[in-house]
């Protein structure tokens, strides 16, 4: 018996959501990896549809982690600030290329006294979202330490990284432009995909989480194909900050069908 909630109509992905900035993206292709598309069409995605992929959200106190998750999952925004104690999580169900896919979004505390508690839940993440306040330079500077802490419990080669600037609605165009330049540099340094959002207005929130779901799904299917004996895992999802071509290709052969 399937105990998971049914997929909502607004959580169905038939195509790959695009990145926000090509200069800081995990990859810039317009479509899903050909082998992923083929595997979905042939119903050869293995156990991907039954797995729950863990996504952890980290960052300084009051940068807007909870508001970001609540805006996407519940379409709400609470102006009354309440600090997260320890950890909390939300489950989101998607359908990607006809395959059910689940994300578990872990909202972690940014307070120092809860850091030890929160860090125990970092392990097993398939994606790490580092949130900073677009109006607070210090929160951006701290993002590298948050990443370092999260990677202590995870294999860096097996997680997707996202750097998200929050509270865009509070920034003037001039302020945002300056902060974005710094944020893009950090994103390139840590090999993360950059996004800017506003949980108050909802700007880019839905697009961002759809992108997270799609790329996590893609990585899961490619891993499943590799596990099942595929000879070529395809494209490696990582930024190459030393090359204009941000998408590193493990194999330049165009796959037309799954082996």
Curated annotation (Swiss-Prot):
It holds the Pfam family Ras. A motif (Switch 2) lies at residues 108-127. Keywords: Acetylation, Cell projection, Cilium biogenesis/degradation, Cytoplasm, Cytoplasmic vesicle, Cytoskeleton, Golgi apparatus, GTP-binding, Hydrolase, Lipoprotein, Magnesium, Membrane, Metal-binding, Nucleotide-binding, Phosphoprotein, Prenylation, Protein transport, Transport. The modification N-acetylmethionine is found at residue 1. GO terms for molecular function: GTP binding; GTP-dependent protein binding; GTPase activity; guanyl nucleotide binding; small GTPase binding. The modification Phosphoserine is found at residue 241. It is an enzyme of class 3 (hydrolase). It is a lipid-anchor. Mg(2+) binds at residues 66, 84, 107. One of its GO terms (biological process) is phagosome-lysosome fusion. The keyword Thylakoid does not apply. InterPro entries: P-loop_NTPase, Rab, Small_GTP-bd, Small_GTPase. Switch 1, switch 2 and the interswitch regions are characteristic of Rab GTPases and mediate the interactions with Rab downstream effectors. The switch regions undergo conformational changes upon nucleotide binding which drives interaction with specific sets of effector proteins, with most effectors only binding to GTP-bound Rab. PANTHER family: RAS-RELATED PROTEIN RAB (PTHR47977). Belongs to the small GTPase superfamily. Rab family. Interacts with RILP. The GTP-bound form interacts with REP15. This is Ras-related protein Rab-34. It comes from Rattus norvegicus.
């Amino acid at each position: 018996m399937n105990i998971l909630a049914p997929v909502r109509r607004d959580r169905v992905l038939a195509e790959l959501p695009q990145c926000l900035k090509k200069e800081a993206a995990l990859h810039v292709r317009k479509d899903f990896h050909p082998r992923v598309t083929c595997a979905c069409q042939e119903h050869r995605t293995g156990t991907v549809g039954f797995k729950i992929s863990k996504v952890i959200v980290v960052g300084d106190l009051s940068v807007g982690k909870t508001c970001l998750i609540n805006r996407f999952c519940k379409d709400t925004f609470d102006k009354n600030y309440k600090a997260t104690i320890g950890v909390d999580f939300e489950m989101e169900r998607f359908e990607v290329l006809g395959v059910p896919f689940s994300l578990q979004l872990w909202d972690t505390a940014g307070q120092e006294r809860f850091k030890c508690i929160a860090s125990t839940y970092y392990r097993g993440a398939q994606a790490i979202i580092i949130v900073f306040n677009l109006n607070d330079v210090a929160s951006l500077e701290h993002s590298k330490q948050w990443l370092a802490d999260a990677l202590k419990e995870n294999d860096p080669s097996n997680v997707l990284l996202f750097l998200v600037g929050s509270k865009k609605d509070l920034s003037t165009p001039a302020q945002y432009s300056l902060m974005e330049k710094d944020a893009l540099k950090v994103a390139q340094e840590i090999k993360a995909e950059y996004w800017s959002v506003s949980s108050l207005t909802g700007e880019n929130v839905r697009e961002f989480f759809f992108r997270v779901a799609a790329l996590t799904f893609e990585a899961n299917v490619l891993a499943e194909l590799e596990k099942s004996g595929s000879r070529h895992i395809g494209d490696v999802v990582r930024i190459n900050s030393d090359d204009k071509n941000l998408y590193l290709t493990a194999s330049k052969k165009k796959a037309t069908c799954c082996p």
